[in-house]
Amino acid sequence: SFIVTSGGELLKFVDKKKVKIFKLPVQSKNPLLIFINSIILIGIILLNNISIVHARSRAPAWSCLLASKITGRKFVTTFHGTYNFKTNLKKFYNSVMTRSDLIIAGSNFIFSHIKENYSEYLNDKKKLLVIFRGINVDYFDASTTIESDEKKLLKNWEIEKDKKIILLPGRLTSWKGQEVFIEAINLINIELGYEAFYAVILGSDQGRELYKKKLLRLSEQYRMSKQIRFIDNCKNMALAYKVSDLIVSASNEPEAFGRVAVEAQSMRKPIIASNIGGSNETVIDKKTGF
């Protein structure tokens, strides 16, 4: 197998003996770079006799589309987001994910979203099917964490080990619902008091410094600065779930699949998720979550 990527944390999990990695600026939306990437991809495809090209993101998908057309290779895309569009230009940009020979939808919700919004790009020759996103259940296994690591993590988070923890994982962006989460914590405090538990907002701001400052101001406004922990990242998410007592997915826009809910369930932790999008397929109310 071959991977073309601009880099990232997940590269450390790739078996370098079985997979060859090429690094290109495929994350760029610059039309010139997209074209240059496609030319380089053509060379990679031909030199390595690659028969199937698979894209999971829009910018590299445009490069892959051009490269696969020129080389005559099969093209597969995984449509794993709603890719909001307010203009026809944005919709056209998104449509590359439906221009492949095979379109994989990450959930029934995404399957319906494609049919409803991109029908003009679909035809009888294209196949559209649902393949649910998977998780590594061996990694997200509550029995595999080490107690000493759990204590170390709590110490790093500056949380007392006998206190309950409510965890909201996800990058800091408005649609992930961090503001709603803080508002909800404030309401719980009114009922239970500030000393009852800690709340952890776990995720990088990815450059959204103004949004993070807004969240910090909101927590200060409700006098929760000492109760809420803002953690940029955690290299061992299984451990983060293990030390937490309740997991929350507060997204105010539909999740394509709802990975947080499934990871929490795999770790045998209760999950509260928004009643929209893919979460409706991964959380059965009052049975596998709320």
Residue ranges and their predicted role:
Residues 164-190, 213:
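A conserved mid-protein helix/loop that constitutes part of the nucleotide-sugar donor-binding site
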